[in-house]
A protein has these predicted regions:
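Cytosolic juxtamembrane regulatory segments of multi-pass membrane proteins
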Residues: 117-139, 232-243, 282, 390-398, ...
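Extracytosolic and intramembrane catalytic regions of membrane-associated proteins
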Residues: 422-485
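Hydrophobic alpha-helical transmembrane segments in integral membrane proteins
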Residues: 374-379, 390-416
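Juxtamembrane membrane-water interface segments of multi-pass membrane proteins
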Residues: 1-9, 13, 26-29, 48-60, ...
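Short aromatic-rich membrane-water interface segments that cap or initiate transmembrane helices
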Residues: 154, 187-201, 269-287, 345-356
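Alpha-helical transmembrane segments of multi-pass integral membrane proteins
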Residues: 120-133, 153-175, 201-207, 236-259, ...
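Hydrophobic membrane-spanning alpha-helices of multi-pass integral membrane proteins
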Residues: 11-14, 40-44, 61-71, 161-169, ...
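Transmembrane-helix bundle segments that line or gate the permeation/cavity pathway
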Residues: 23-181, 197-219
Length: 485
């Protein structure tokens, strides 16, 4: 049997086993835990293939085990659905590192294009890799026809031929005798809906697993394309940057004059409160910073930098934009602080602030790499910055932070949104149990009632399992005052 066929059969059998495991996890294991265990099953399947001598995994995959294990643990650590989605995104970034395209370029030199192609490569492998495995990798004509395999093939062919024959004769005999008809009907009374559900899940996850395992085990990796030089001159690229720099500079001057100038100055000019003034700009400023980064990357890529003088002028314009963006992000952070003091903290505000922190890191890394002629190092650094922010989010426990900030505001006499408090995940429950008793207000008791009702129902359903949900204290929540109704 050719080695490629032997490897293909091993991958196919492993994929079917993973499909069975996925079906079992989907039906028997609570949500969140099933995803973490599924990742573990995939890793164990790869190890089993290597230990059995069926495949040889690229050496570049070994260092990815540690971040994948940490992310799998993070999936079941916190209860926040938003953080769960971000952790899944982190798993996807590890998968992109494992793609043949990124492996070929090397993690230290893989650019953003390599990561994009690698992600597309994995997506395509998941969708169509199983078909290539069955139709191209496995030479079915080369399979041995003697011994057990021959007998097994004969049995399968015989069963396939016997089914329609038995169906025809059985139908005639059932019509001939009503007693026989009833006995056969009772014996073959099968509910096909659950069987179809199980079979569909096994085939779906087996199909996806076959494509993923195949591309991870593929020894040949695509050749990374060298970066092509830009063709545009400084007149085209520099004009765009200069105009944007002037616009940013004008905005920054306004920030120093009014936002950082105090509430009286703002109220006298606009007629609105300081908090209302700050409320309008946070998300817009973060969007401006997020759009500026790809614009700078595109400008660097499109500029013909063979002339050193032209390259230096471009870098000065880009560096000025980075400095102005830092001031604008500081303005956004200042606005968020005022906004939170007046209106409280929500998930959207918290995670947008975290995204802003990632932007600060990436903009600094852009200046340290791209503006110094080391563009190929930017992609991996941006990815590592994302991992750093993700780790900080998992350690910080966002929902607990949100609950703590809003409880502190309530203790200072500000209103507490009981409905929003009940929408937070189980990560916030310990903070509410500590903070609500010291309030002793009607709003606190309303929040306690909503929290008890929600988490009593969710725990009874056992729809998901996380460490935070399992460890959250049970029982009534004290609100520091007697409840009515």
């Amino acid at each position: 049997m050719p080695p490629r066929t032997r490897q293909g059969l091993a991958i196919l059998a492993t994929a079917l086993a993973l499909g069975l495991v996925a079906d079992l996890l989907a039906h028997q294991v609570p949500a969140r835990l099933d995803v973490a265990l599924g990742l573990g099953a995939l890793v164990l399947a790869l190890v089993a293939l290597v230990q059995g001598g069926h495949v040889v995994l690229p050496a570049a995959l070994a260092p990815l085990g540690a971040p994948l294990a940490l992310l799998a643990a993070a999936l079941i650590w916190r209860d926040s659905p938003t953080l769960f989605a971000l952790n899944l995104l982190g798993v996807g970034s590890v998968a992109a590192l494992a793609s043949p395209r990124v492996r070929a370029a090397g993690p230290r030199r893989a650019g953003l294009g390599d990561y994009a192609v690698g992600a597309a490569e994995l997506a395509w492998a998941s969708a169509g890799g199983a078909a290539a495995l069955v139709l191209a990798d496995i030479d079915w004509a080369a399979l041995p026809v003697e011994g057990r395999l021959r007998h097994a093939r004969g049995t399968v062919v015989g069963l396939a031929a016997a089914v329609p024959v038995a169906a025809v004769f059985g139908g005639l005999l059932m019509q001939a005798d009503p007693v026989f008809d009833r006995l056969v009907g009772r014996t073959l009374q099968i509910d096909l809906a659950p069987l179809a559900s199980h079979a569909g899940l096994v085939l779906l996850w087996g199909w996806l697993a076959a494509g993923v395992v195949r591309v991870l085990c593929r020894p040949e990796a695509g050749v990374a394309r060298p970066r092509s030089g830009g063709t545009l001159g400084l007149g085209e690229v520099g004009t765009v940057l200069a105009v944007v720099d002037l616009l940013f500079l004008a905005f920054v001057v306004v920030q120093f004059r009014y936002l950082f100038g105090g509430a009286d100055l703002v109220r006298g000019l606009t007629g609105v409160s300081y908090a209302e003034y700050a409320r309008r700009g946070f998300f817009e400023l973060v969007t401006v910073a997020a759009l500026s980064l790809p614009m700078l990357l595109l400008a660097d890529w499109s500029l013909d930098q063979r002339d050193p003088l032209r390259a230096r002028r471009f870098r000065r314009l880009a560096l000025l934009m980075l400095l102005l963006l830092d001031v604008m992000l500081a303005s956004a952070l200042f606005r968020m602080r005022l906004y939170t003091e007046s209106y409280g903290l929500t998930e959207l505000r918290f995670y947008t602030t975290a995204f802003m922190g990632w932007l600060v890191l990436v903009l600094g890394w852009f200046g340290a790499t791209v503006l110094r002629g080391r563009r190929e190092r930017f992609g991996t650094g941006a990815l590592l910055a994302g991992w750093l922010v993700l780790a900080a989010l998992n350690l910080a426990n966002p929902d607990a932070v949100i609950a703590g900030v809003n409880l502190d505001r309530a203790a200072a006499g500000r209103p507490l949104d009981a409905d929003y408090a009940a929408e937070l995940s189980a990560d916030a429950l310990p903070a509410f149990r500590r903070g609500l008793p010291r309030l002793g207000t009607v709003e606190a008791c309303a929040a306690a009632t909503r929290l008890e009702r929600r988490w009593g129902d969710e725990r009874a359903g056992k729809a998901r399992w996380t460490i935070a949900l399992a460890r959250a204290p049970r029982g009534p929540i004290d609100c520091g005052a007697g409840r009515s109704g």
